[in-house]
Amino acid sequence: MTYKYIITQSLAMLMSLASNAFEVKSGQMVVVSADTARMEPVAKTALKMLKGDIRKVLGSEMKLVNTSVNSSIILQRDAAAFAYKKEAFLLKSANGCLYIKGSDDHGLAYGILEVSRLLGVSPWKWWADAEPKQLKAFSLKEGYHNEQSPSVEYRGIFINDEDWGLMPWSGKTYEPSDIPGHIGPKTNARIFELLLRLRANTYWPAMHECTRPFFLTEGNREVALQYGIYIGGSHCEPMASSTAGEWKMRGVGEYDFLNNRENVLQFWEDRVKEVAGQPILYTIGMRGVHDGAMQGAKTTEEQKTVLDSVLKAQRELLGKYVNKDVAQVPQLFVPYKEVLDVYHAGLQVPEDVCLVWCDDNYGMVRHFPTAEERARKGGNGIYYHVSYWGRPHDYLWLGTFSPALLYQQMSEAWHKGIQKFWILNVGDIKPAEYQIELFLDMAWNMNRIYSGDTPEKELQPNNEWLAEHEWNFWTREFGRKLAAGMLPVMQESYRLAYIRKPEFMANTRCEERNPKYKIISDLPWSEVYIRARLADYKSISDKAEKIGGMLDKAIAKGELPKERKDEFYQLFKYPVQAAAQMNNKLLYGQLARHGKEISGSSRDVSAEYWKKSEAAYDSIISLTKVYNEGYYNQGKWNRMMDFQPRRLPVFNRVPHTVATQPLAKDPEYIACLSANDCISASPLYLWKGLGYECKAIGIVRNQEIGFVFDGKKVKGDSVTIEVRWVPTHPMDDKLRFSLSLDGGKPVEGEVQTRGRSEQWKVNTLQCQARVSFTLPVARMKKHRILIKALDEGLVLDQVCVY
């Protein structure tokens, strides 16, 4: 056999494979074989979406037929092929055809929309003006195989605190209505389209009193059915009833199960009868009308007695109207705030009900399931926030929530058995686009991120997956060249906001009785640190402007559609520049209050710093105006972006006052070490991107790690060691550690906090839990600190010595 023969045969094989590839050329009719008569609405809706995507990308039309003959795409539903997994799909290229198989109609829909992704259509096509690029042809090689299935059964988002964004945008801009608080079917169809593109299936609708309730708005039920979305409700919205908005409209008397039982039951029964034939995730239990404790019952024991009766009565209604086997009805119980105390007091929640745990509203999961809770038939869920209204301070404006924190906490949640239900409080959707996609992608594919992981094993961070996810997001939206500049800027922006969110920069608080928290005042930062932070923001601000110029050139060359300028502004420029200007406004104001000089000048120029602060405020107004008016989208997002939600003091101009106390001084640090600078005999679990320096590490129970610092800088006979932790909550009861210096007797510290204590508020606002020890020190060249984790769940950020 000659080399010539081998090469000839190889080329023949390659040509054969190429000839059998699935290919669609621009303008070519795409024939799809589908038994639409047997399809559920969700799959039909996905086909309509694909049809529009094909027309947009290829300029081709799509034709549906009921035979596979001469079809280029063949749809099939086959539960057995996926071992009866829910919502699974397979894409396979064979003999010039593309086969899309689904284990059910949801799986088929996700498979259909996977083709849209392969065509280059972003899930944010509509919601971020991500206009797709046009192609001359699209192909998949012979043998292409893409099989996927969800890790979490119920995955979705919660629209919340919509008063200044989504609600006025919907009711006045996108879907104008004379009905106050209108969020109607046109808006919800767009939300559900996004959910399908992100492979989600669950929705908690907006529920503030300012918004007309979902089920009382004509057309909303029908559009949810069309998109195959499970409708649910938060911890204070049992039985598919938005209590905050609906009780005053259709309830009778007080919302008090103890003293008004029949009317409360009728309120729930009317709704269950109405929606019995629709996919609903029923939240069961009871709280107050809106995020308050239930009426009537005062003590924990009384609340337990009432809740026990509530659960029995609610399940009787579900058995009567939805399914006689009530265990087949999806149900959630959310032990939130005072209800968690009732649960811990011994409330018996039926075995088939999913327990939904919560974070502390700032991204730290409060409870991880015990072994007994993990074994429950109903499983465990999570209600997580990347946007929040409440104490100690709102963060509703900019989507600065740390992706690394979300990734770390949701990885821990999955690892500890929270795998049935994931819901994300997203505010108004915009501007939390990346966090939403990260959360839902994790819910979809956690099995591939952490294959084979069990709670008995230590969780090992998969930093490569997160880095790849971030890179893929930005390259998909803007291409590799722009993404190479954008990603580092966004990572630095997230890091700076992790240290202090833009909304926290005035040193004010929400819902506090003490009037001092309503007044803009100094942050406890030194002049050196303030100037360094201003420089960091100037650096990313300048880079963002430079990248904007690169985008304009790419559009001018035809490398990107012009509409991507709007997307660039929404996803990148506005969040970066608005955060930078918020810091400029408040930090230049702080320097001005203290009469500080511009670097290199010997004169008092506080007036010039006041001008910088004022200019930053004006800049935020201008930036927001551009966001709402757009470049090419004709004001599509008008009223979506409000730079001062709830009209809190932090959003005002900084009052021109004179400080009566000096600026804080930094300690004379002997050493300030990143957690990743430690020495350990056992493996270190680095959470890349997490913490003040993006190098936080998880320490497993009984693991000991060491730090070394130079003795030359030690001046006295004692040192203070400040251990700075990511302010997580215990996985069991406590978060303790021990520390020793130079082999001395270990001292013990605690990281956990109680409820909404003052220490928790401080930790939350600075995103660190700091524990200090002052210890005697001898003269030596090198000193060694040993830190040992006494409990599970500790994540170390920094160790500072002074």
What residues fall within each predicted segment?
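Bacterial Sec-dependent N-terminal signal peptides
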Residues: 1-23
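Contiguous, structured surface segment used for ligand recognition
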Residues: 20-149
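The substrate-binding groove and active-site-proximal loops of carbohydrate-active enzymes
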Residues: 101-102, 163-184, 201-211, 247-263, ...
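An acidic-aromatic substrate-binding cleft motif
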Residues: 124-180, 186-206, 378-381
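C-terminal non-catalytic alpha-helical accessory regions
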Residues: 130, 134-135, 467-640
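Gly/Pro-rich turn-and-neighbor structural signature
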Residues: 138, 208, 215, 223-226, ...
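Extracytoplasmic
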Residues: 644-802
